[in-house]
Amino acid sequence: MITTRNVTKRFGHVEAVRSVSIDVREGDRYGLLGPNGSGKSTLVRMLLGLVYATSGEILVLGERIPRHASRVLPEIGALIEEPAAYPHLSGRTNLRLLDAAGPNSVRRTRRLRVDEALERVGLAGIDRRPVRTYSLGMRQRLGLASALVRPPRLLILDEPTNGLDPRGIRDIRDLLVSLNESGVTIFLSSHLLPEVSALCTRIGVLDSGQLVLQESLAALQGPTGRVLVSIDDPERAVATLDGQVEHRDGQDLVVRSSDPAALNARLVKAGVRVHALAVQRRSLEEVVLDVTGSGSDQFGVAAAGTAAAPPGAAPPADGAPAVSANDQGTADE
């Protein structure tokens, strides 16, 4: 679906993206993770032909970008940072105008498709209000709706949960999983590690413009070679395991072992009652922080995906049951 080969982008003497090669397969939920300023947005813009690469090759849906972008853009839904909209028009009218401008737009189905897109992102019931009264989170939902008006094969999203509160983030995550299960390939960029971990099946990590990691989430969160064991007789267990115990906390042990079943059998044979046994797995946080050397705050770990409300924000009028309170924001006349 997306392939880049040694893509580099320079702005003057600054390399924003350096020799990046990614591979997004059909059916993926691919998360491009990196701290702010790592080159994520620049790469996303290059995928859509909005920014030209200095060198390298980009293929999207089998076509070279930007040369043949017009062939594939009708099959791509995209949300790039804060979406643009006419502030004096309603969200519904903005979507209708956007759809009408598309080269393959079908007028007779437009109303139904707009209704469905608004419903899916939680804006039904407030879609006739002027966009200038929308909060940041509501504008983000509208931008996602614009990417769904014409059913896409591929969604390319840059920070799609920007401005959303925790409930809004969960709603959008559930929507993206549902779309993916219906056959839509998802590519998104984010600096929020918890959200990428909760949503994506494969990830790439950008650091200072370079791709430092690309792997499936399952492989990254594989076994560590350690087993957590809760037993009734820690002294006998320690003696039985003969140097394999790395840590003891009361009746709980951390044991070096690649074979939990054999470990359990060995303890039982020695007369140690095993209350619980669990394979210790690496967290995505540990892996990403190891390869980037960044602090956890650079990836939204401390905030766990929360988003602050705009300064001075006040909730708009009632009538938006699908949008959570912190997501509704201000009416900026």
Per-region residue spans from a language model:
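ABC-family P-loop ATPase nucleotide-binding domain
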Residues: 1-8, 294-333
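ABC transporter nucleotide-binding domains
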Residues: 2-4, 9-188, 193-207, 213
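Short, flexible turn/loop "capping" segments at secondary-structure junctions
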Residues: 52, 220-222, 247
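Conserved beta-strand-loop-alpha-helix hinge in the C-terminal portion
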Residues: 210-230
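Short, charged/small-residue-rich alpha-helical element at the C-terminal edge
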Residues: 225-294, 299
